[in-house]
A protein has these predicted regions:
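Transmembrane alpha-helices
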Residues: 9, 113, 117, 169, ...
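Membrane-helix interface segments
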Residues: 103-111, 139-140, 159, 189, ...
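Short loop segments and helix-boundary regions at transmembrane helix junctions
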Residues: 2, 96-122, 126, 131-136
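Membrane-embedded alpha-helices of multi-pass transport/permease systems
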Residues: 19-30, 91-95, 124-128, 137, ...
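N-terminal signal-anchor/first transmembrane alpha helix
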Residues: 1-28, 99, 109, 113
């Protein structure tokens, strides 16, 4: 009985927090638009029964989503942002995870804390901080002007560049942590064996380290995408 309760609890949690809200959203998606509160007219009524619901059931809302150009542009734009952001996050996150895995063991908890610590603050505060960094009067433009790399402030806010920066910053730990976990468990003797067999450090990295860390890469890409 105790074992049953231990197994049933997570399923009940899943039912309450995921399946029931999903069923509510599905019900709304099959409803008709109405100028009311809430702004839809449910097709299902307990008084009329399931038969009346099935006789009136249509997927007009879903057909509209697949035929309207506005939604297609939104879908494609979302996929583009997700793909580019995932690629950038991987390129930035892998070297960080590799450096953490190769750092002395006494340093690793501190490095892990530095990765996680910023995300203990409110997301809203971090958004305002990035606005202060990326605005035309922000720190980034001030540094670039001081270095003489630009003559006029760059416009970064309200552009796709700002979107990519925000997405990469937000999801970077979700890329770093799985890759770090995979690299930390890797047997260092495999690298030594590859070098003994004639591989250079770079060749051993591409032929041994990257393949062995592939599960972490895949997990990180799934989490970020």
């Amino acid at each position: 009985m105790r074992r049953f309760l231990l197994i049933a609890f997570p399923y009940a949690w899943l039912l309450a927090l995921f399946l029931i809200p999903f069923a509510i959203v599905l019900k709304i998606s099959l409803s008709d638009v109405a100028l009311a509160r809430p702004p839809y007219m449910p097709q299902f009524s307990w008084d009329e029964g399931i038969g009346a619901f099935l006789s009136q059931l249509d997927f007009e809302n879903f057909v509209f989503l697949t035929t309207d150009d506005l939604y297609w542009k939104a879908y494609l734009s979302s996929l583009k942002i997700a793909a580019i952001s995932t690629t950038i996050t991987l390129l930035v996150g892998y070297p960080i995870a590799y450096a953490m895995a190769r750092a002395p063991e006494s340093w690793r908890p501190t490095l892990m804390m530095l990765i996680i610590l910023p995300f203990w603050t409110s997301f809203l505060i971090r958004v305002y901080a990035w606005q202060g960094i990326l605005s035309q009067e922000g720190y980034l433009n001030q540094v670039l002007l001081w270095l003489g790399l630009i003559s006029t402030p760059l416009t970064i806010l309200n552009t796709s560049t700002a979107v990519y920066i925000g997405v990469v910053y937000t999801y970077l730990p979700f890329m770093i942590l799985p890759i770090y976990a995979a690299l930390e468990k890797m047997d260092g003797s495999l690298i030594e064996a590859a070098e003994d067999l004639g591989c250079s450090r770079s060749s051993a990295f591409w032929l041994v380290t990257i393949p062995l860390s592939r599960p972490g890469i895949v997990a990180g890409c799934f989490l970020v995408f």
